[in-house]
Amino acid sequence: MFRKFTREDIHTRSNVKSSIQRNLKAKLLAQYPKLEEVIDEIIPKKAQIELYKCEGKIQLYLVNGEVLFFQNFDELIPSLRFVHKFPEAFPTVQVDRGAIKFVLAGSNIMCPGLTSPGAKLPEAPGFEKDTIVVINAENKETAMAVGKLLMSTEEIKEINKGHGVEMIHHLGDPLWTFSAD
Amino acid sequence: MPLTNVIYCGVCDFPAEYCEFSGKFKRCKAWLQENHPELYTKWYGDVTEDVSKQLAESSIGDEREEKLEKALEKLERKQQAREERELAKKLSSKVVIRREARTKRKCMIAISGLEVFEIDMKKLSKTFASKFATGCSISKNAEKKEEVIVQGDLADEVEAYIHSLLEEKGMKEVKVEVIDAAKKKKKAETTTTPGSENKK
Ligand SMILES: [Zn+2]
């Protein structure tokens, strides 16, 4: 999603009104309930959320100059910097060591990279198709990417062919290197 | 429930455990050793030979691991070559500050050559506008390259600021050339033919 993103793609920057700010937080919690216990630490009550409207209907939400989450359609997607603060809150899958290089190059993730011995998928029933998932790597503790399931995790195990996760955001992409100033 | 505190590499900005994939691994390791010696020892030990063995204990098997290591080495070489090229390009380029007459009394300053040094021109023009309380804009010059235009006779101030900016970026050696086109034009009217001053 951010492969070609540059500063030029930001159309407008504005502060989010406090009423809408409350709605946003509620929406985040509805999507990621485990954030409940840390949300006020990550987005303090007095913090000002900024909204950057960008090319391609991408909306970035920033707190203290850091992109915390973004939106393309309806769902809110956390940035990796956000994920790193509280990884437990997000559905997570793991790829094997061999897939890391490709993920960091922005490729979609192929099913075998998610089902091999070094990989990890949740036990049944697992996650539905279209779930936003955080992508971890074998022998690593921190997440390296955020993507969207192209099939349910059970289907990934069963079919084990083709693209399993659509890449949205990864370490080293322009969103990762983006700084507000 | 406390927030997790990830250690980001000071060289590649990845979480430090991903440095091996950054293409800057050598410098990353030096940084880690300096800043987080305990992690350095934990991950890379004292003998680098052991590292690859340690890492090879992954699920993908010796053969693929070896291939991966080779690919990562290649990545690093490429990255290094690219950085060297970029540095050479920077060092052989220069910033040009041109003072131009606007009216008989007023003049403006055009700064070109900034793009090579990854200087954000929009930001710079905003800085100049507030710093010098003057009009400042970005426009394309005859070579279709962007330049920053500052209204007013501010060549010296602009030069000093550009120098400090370059120094901040660790590019102190970069040349900044100041061309006084306003003066020359006056001279040109009396002594030389126009056009000869452009050659410089
Ligand atoms: Zn690094």
From Swiss-Prot, chain B:
Tagged with keyword Ribonucleoprotein: yes
NCBIfam families according to UniProt: DRP1
Residue ranges of every copy of the SUI1 domain listed in the record: 95-166
Main location class: cytoplasm
Localization terms from the record: Cytoplasm
Transmembrane segments: none
GO CC list: cytoplasm; ribonucleoprotein complex; ribosome
An MF annotation (GO) of this entry: translation initiation factor activity
GO BP field: formation of translation preinitiation complex; translation reinitiation
Keyword Ribonucleoprotein annotated: yes
UniProt name for this protein: Translation machinery-associated protein 22
Domain remark in the UniProt entry: The SUI1 domain may be involved in RNA binding.
Subunit structure: Interacts with the 40S ribosomal subunit.
Family: Belongs to the DENR family.
Pfam families: DENR_N, SUI1
Keywords on record: Cytoplasm, Ribonucleoprotein, Ribosomal protein
